[in-house]
Amino acid sequence: DLTENRLSNSLLQAGLNDSTSSAINIFSADVKTALAPAIVDVSRNDTSELNTFDFKMTNPEVFNMPAGPVGMLVGFEYRSESYSDDRDPRLDGTIQFQSAVTGLGFPFVGDVLGSSPTVDTSAKRSTNSVFAEMVMPLTNKMEAQFAMRHEDPDDTKSSTVWKAALGWEIANDVLLRGSKSTSFRVPNLIQANQLYVTRSGNVDDAVGEFVGANDPLDDRYQIQSYRIGNPELLPEESDNTSWGFVWTPSNIEGLTVTWDDWRIEKDNTIVLFGRTNAMVADLVARINYGPDNCGGYNNPAIIRDQNPGYTSAEIAKFAAAGICPAGEAFTIYDEYTNAATRSIAGQDIGIYYDISTEVGDFNITVNHSETTEFEQKPTNAYQALVDAQASGVIPFDITFAGFGNLAGLDGNYVEKTSVKFNYRVGDLGVQLSSLRKGEFYHSSETRSDGTRYVIPSMTTVNASVYYWFDIGDQKARVKFAVKNLEDERAPLADRFYGFFADAHQDYGRNFYLDIKVKF
């Protein structure tokens, strides 16, 4: 992967400080020519490899039960996976840049303007696994399935998971179904093996908010997050439960209705504490420390400007707030870790109706999902923030997120409904669809009294018409589609583009014409 026309920080800094005629002239009308001495190409060589070997034996009739034969499968699998990420010398620290303004250099600042420094990484993992599956007819109307799998990676603890499922046709048009299972996910090779990676992003500085908005410390600016890999990470493990029914009424041909209730309990969720939470933790620590003996305060998780150049009046504002003065933060150290239990539960409803008539074929699909619970039990560090806010140490407009009740928080809408309609007669077809995403609240806009800023639901409608025809011996299709038919705009949010991009899109009404030929 090669990216051209990037700017080197070290070459740019040297060119701007050059006192000769070769200096970079930022006032030149020909910007590209002026910056040419600092323009570089940036490369990245990423390689991943997966080798597998498996052996399976099956028997459709291991033994017989009154309702029929029992089928079984057993097997063994070996997997070897490797990953190598070779970054450009200007990103991996081979060629380093040190800022003449902040004094920061690698690994906090890379030599490519606008790109975070990233060290080279390589890792590999081998896994042995054995598994077995069984299908057992209990009665003519009831069937059970059982499965078990044991995985033994060479770089983390082994795990054994299982699944049991039951289907019971209690009537000719009603099927009850349920399952209970466990699952696991090992840390990916990057989380477990990368020494560190630096990423930049905007952050709300809780200290600046607490002392006074942008006076004397900015309350929002860009910061580096120094994410540290952790070879001691444990696999994520979960217990999954689901039950529901399928109804296919015999008196309404083509109609199927499904309903399922599900729950997932996951332990050892791999998380980062997060730069916003780290800022709030620094504020709580400063409040607890007090305004005296400020030279003795130290927070190893955050590197701040030690010489912010505050005036006596500005220092007095920190003292009035009861904390020691703090400069802007440059970097936050954040290590991958295993968190406590995460609980997710919800319900899904599906309606599917297919009908053929003399005027064409109709297909209608309605899906609705609702999340009834989404909670991440807090780590000790996060619980300290919750307790500080509950006791009044910090106000409610100092926000933090990622733990606790996550339902309806920052893009985690709890309701989603989709409707699809298809009609086809001969070679002509029409499609209509709609998608509704429910409301959620924007945590960073919470008021000091705890009032939440709610981002309303958003519904978009798409429509298309297509026609199949022949081009010689080949089948071809022409399709005209309108996306976001009603020109719905994304709800307003305090984000970079004015809307919550993690949940919404703001393309407005748009069209496209698609021509496809099958060879």
Residues covered by each model-derived region:
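Surface-exposed extracellular loop regions of Gram-negative outer-membrane beta-barrel proteins
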Residues: D1, F27-A29, T52, K56, ...
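C-terminal beta-signal and adjacent terminal beta-strands/loops
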Residues: D267, T372-E375, S433-E445, Y467-F519
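Surface-exposed, low-complexity loop segments enriched in small/polar and acidic residues
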Residues: D1-T127, D155, S181-E232, D260-A345, ...
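Transmembrane beta-strands of outer-membrane beta-barrel pores
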Residues: E61, Y78-S84, M148-D154, K180-V186, ...
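Short loop/turn motifs that connect adjacent beta-strands in outer-membrane beta-barrel proteins
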Residues: V62-V70, L138-M142, D173, S250-T256, ...
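Hydrophobic, lipid-facing positions within transmembrane beta-strands of outer-membrane proteins
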Residues: E49-F55, N128-M134, T160-L166, G229, ...
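Transmembrane beta-strands of outer-membrane beta-barrel proteins
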Residues: V70-V74, A144-F146, W162, L176-G178, ...
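C-terminal beta-barrel architecture of Gram-negative outer-membrane proteins
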Residues: R199, I364-D470, E486
